[in-house]
């Protein structure tokens, strides 16, 4: 059973009565009449209306498939793209920045590197007492103090703005802060409170005037006590104010230990004894800090950074540090009290490993409901009842407590560099938290009533000051209006999109006209596609308020203003109903109906079609004649010259309906500049004779003007001028060929490039290897290349350039000697050094190149009396030791240990050569961003192949094989280095790539170990392309390369801090200075 034929199942069956366009045009040409059936065939009206094609078919004017996507389909752009993409094109939606409610805190914009200020401002704002103090300021005071004014406005917006985040730019600009420089948040808080304290002192409102001192200021005293008499020093009674307590955390695990360390007693003994006024002598004593009073809000500054004297930089301490949810500070006072219990109210966090970079966020507790919030610039996240987020499996309205005596506690973990957990506790029901990034802790005193029960004494008067109400309302109104305008704009646009889609679907549904319909209209496919696919079609005209596109049918019109059959693939056949819908709305045109087919174009098409058939048939009939002409078989009769390459290409071209540009100029390549026939031996002038019939066809279809075509009958004579010129050139080439042949024969061994066997006692002459290489290439060039290579430089000029003017000695050395199998030769080179030639060759060179025989550079092979003598001879060129074999050793033994070397006349000028080589070496070592290769060797010793590659001397401009860089084991790396790169920097690169700490790296070039970390690669003669190898000694433990880089920074920028801002002006200047010294 045969299988069904499925190869053409996707093709539409052609109607039985359909003729090909070529047949229809032939009929029109022969009869001169155009029938209705002919129009249906040529305009493809007969094709059925299709449904469900994969794409729009150009071959059918009745196909409207693919102009819009399928049902529920989308496109990447235009009218049919996804709705969210259309909305995105309208611009950002301001409603996305809408604040849920005033119960949800608002964020602050980061202007580049102002996260340190944002975090502090959020901590201050969330402190209700501080916020009320700022809100109670008089308008006159705000006008007098711009910083207070901007702070109050910022707090007012954080309080009542409808936006989810507030622009902090006006406040930052007023403080004159550089928003591109990261600063220390602790330093900012200290200076900012000092600035506020001075500005607030002008207020007459008691709650505002001393709000900073009341909330944040406590007092301490430094007590020095004599161990002999037990008396305190006079200075011990002096109390000093503090706004935060700076606690060490290095080597300490929790807040209790840090407080113990802060209040610990220091012994003054030995050389550090104290002079007691009472005892009137130096005695042992103790010194400690005593807390005299505590403010309602205690700020603990954790010293996360340590100073590295070696690099004058700061390094962050990233160890975990624990702190409690409640803290009893009463026992820490010099006069203990039970009413000083503090609750954790804010945590300032520094994310990042470096001291001068990273990011600040704040976790702050809402005093009104106990909820914790994370403030990360513009983003504010609810954390629940725990400062680092809710516990797994616990509801947000319950805290986790353990009874007295419990040994463990549940853990709360935050993996975002904050590793927070609850630690063990034994004395009270409390929570402990731990963080590797906590930078500052804020604790607020817990108020208790007379019965000892915690009370919330937050004032209910938390409304916005009246002088900010109008401003905030105006801002909110403007913002709400902006949101409403956007929503309105979006609704209008989406309604328009929906309307346009319905319109397109409606028109395209009605668009197809059946083949039987006599009334239809033509429309440009390009315009229809753009109209169906674009939101706003191009070429606008205004109708009402919406811009529409007028119909443009000009691309499918012929010069007679009608519809040509040749444009049928660029237009569609619309039903009358669909056309009237489009035309009534968009206008334009011109209107092209079913009666607007072009009779003139149809007749021209019929004529051209017949002409194409004639051209195709004539060319096919003449192909055999052209093939015979190329084979040299021409019939009797007149013959004409054409270009042989041209005719070959003419035969290879595929059959086409009309002549192409390639058919022009069958004799152009045969025509000289004088308009005559080129001699056949001229370049590109190969020709062939063709019969007259073929020539006339080529002549008529050449596409050139009649006057531009040059005809050459077979009896045409070549151009006399060109023939004479070619004869001269041929004569010169013949003479040159003879000269080169003679030199090749005279210098047969030298031409072959074989090494010359050298014998002691014979006289030789020296020629530059580079000149000899050029001469060899010159005399061996034959055929078409005989005159292409230039003649080498004059030998006399070359010889003269080898003599230094200062000492009249040689500026180059002879090539090294090689002794193999008892024969002495020179090392081969095409570029460097001097090559020795025989005396006979030099005599011939003297005659051939017109050089005086006496100008030759003489050389001979001599033997040293001893190896030491050889090394001391400046003009001696020793043999290569690595090329010695057994025969050489035997020869050396026969000569009593003497070695051969080259003695020259004149002598080699070692002084000038040394100076030249030094300059070349310096230039070569002054490289930038070049590649070197480093191999990791495992085992006691590097393989021989790596050692040899590492010890090899790099050749200038040598092409390095790419294969040498490939490795399957991953033990080879390519590094970009410069001559100024230090060995230390190179070891860091190897550390980063291969993971070997620099102390364990045994780095070699060849067999020599590379030491001295401060030396440069130029100092160690490491060139571009060198191969190094490294071995891991495994003596020292692995560590992070980031630690090494941070500790070894050479360039350290001076920290400017807040210099040049309002924070360091007048009253704050001395405080800033004190902070700098303490750091």
Swiss-Prot record:
This is Ubiquitin carboxyl-terminal hydrolase 26. It comes from the Eukaryota. It comes from Oryza sativa subsp. japonica. GO terms for biological process: protein deubiquitination; proteolysis; regulation of protein stability. One of its GO terms (molecular function) is cysteine-type endopeptidase activity. Belongs to the peptidase C19 family. Disulfide bonds: none annotated. InterPro entries: DUSP-like_sf, Papain-like_cys_pep_sf, Pept_C19_DUSP, Peptidase_C19, Peptidase_C19_UCH, Ubiquitin-like_dom, Ubiquitin-like_domsf, Ubl_USP48. Residues 402-417 have a biased composition (Polar residues). Gene3D superfamilies: Cysteine proteinases, DUSP-like, Phosphatidylinositol 3-kinase Catalytic Subunit, Chain A, domain 1. Residues 106-446 form the USP domain. Its EC number is 3.4.19.12. Residues 961-1037 form the Ubiquitin-like domain. It is an enzyme of class 3 (hydrolase).
